[in-house]
């Protein structure tokens, strides 16, 4: 029996990258999943968007594990669409035990050149989108009365200053406050909330040449901020998914309000 037998997870941003890895790894451990992704451009994001074909591939990979999967194209900036997908999952699968708030975007700029639109796009997706995701499932956790687990994918940038990504860094710091507030407010209901803070990961979002150019031009002054202390340049998605599986499992039943670093020493610099 897998570590997540009996669990049903609601996962955003699951078309590719970390989100796909989380969905497949959770399914391999016995969870059924409800997955979503916008599968299209998001404002000023500097990363090429996921596609409907990407989401279909995630569905295929989950189904190959033998687990059930419900999916739809959903923008986390649209709370009613998130609520509708959550309710569909509850109707078809019976309940939800776990939320993995993974959807996010990244853009970059010198802060004095950052536009209002660039700022707002990242805040709307990374911070408000996570709030919308929490609100889509929290009432169900309370009504069901059997606890629940919120796993919020933040970033190393949620625990340290990261230049050239002011909106992203601000949003990811905001997620720490959100998680800690949830953990305190809803602990009495056995509802847990934790955040994960990863170093760079080998995904489309982790491969951003434009940001690399900004860093390279200032390698002496800011370069070390982006460097791991361990001898690895980038993490693999599975490194983060292993933490997700743990936090979703009963092994972590009393773990809440945690900022879990999967960072190869990055935050320590």
Where are these regions (language model features)?
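Substrate-binding pocket helix/loop in short-chain dehydrogenase/reductase
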Residues: 110-111, 115-123
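Active-site helix of classical SDR
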Residues: 134, 171, 179
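Residue(s) in the substrate-gating loop at a strand-loop-helix junction
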Residues: 155
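Short C-terminal tail/terminal secondary-structure segment
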Residues: 160, 231-232, 244-245, 256-269
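Short, small/polar-rich loop/turn modules that mediate ligand/substrate recognition or access, typified
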Residues: 187, 192, 255-257
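A conserved structural motif in NAD(P)-dependent oxidoreductases
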Residues: 228-240
């Amino acid at each position: 029996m897998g570590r997540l037998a009996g669990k049903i997870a609601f996962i955003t941003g699951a078309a590719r990258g970390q989100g796909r890895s989380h969905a497949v790894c959770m399914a391999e451990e016995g969870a059924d999943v409800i997955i979503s992704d916008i599968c299209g451009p998001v404002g000023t994001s500097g990363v090429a968007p996921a596609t409907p074909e990407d989401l279909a591939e995630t569905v295929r990979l989950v189904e190959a594990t033998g687990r059930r999967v419900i999916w739809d194209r959903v923008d986390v900036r649209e709370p009613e669409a998130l609520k509708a997908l959550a309710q569909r999952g509850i109707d078809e699968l019976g309940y939800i035990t776990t939320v993995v708030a993974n959807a996010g975007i990244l853009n970059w700029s010198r802060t004095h050149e950052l536009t209002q639109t660039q700022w707002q796009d990242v805040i709307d997706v990374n911070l408000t989108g996570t709030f919308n995701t929490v609100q889509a499932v929290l009432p169900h956790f309370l009504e069901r009365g059997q606890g629940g687990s919120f796993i919020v994918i933040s970033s190393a940038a949620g625990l340290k200053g990261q230049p050239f990504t002011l909106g992203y860094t601000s949003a990811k710091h905001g997620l720490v406050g959100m998680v800690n507030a949830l953990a305190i407010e809803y602990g009495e209901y056995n509802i847990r909330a934790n955040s994960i803070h990863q170093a760079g990961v080998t995904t489309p979002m982790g491969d951003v040449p434009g940001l690399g150019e900004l860093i390279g031009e200032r390698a002496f002054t800011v370069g070390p901020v982006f460097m791991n202390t361990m001898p690895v340049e980038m993490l693999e998605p599975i490194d983060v998914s292993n933490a997700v599986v743990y936090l979703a499992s009963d092994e972590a039943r009393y773990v809440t309000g945690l900022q879990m670093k999967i960072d190869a020493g990055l935050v320590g610099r």
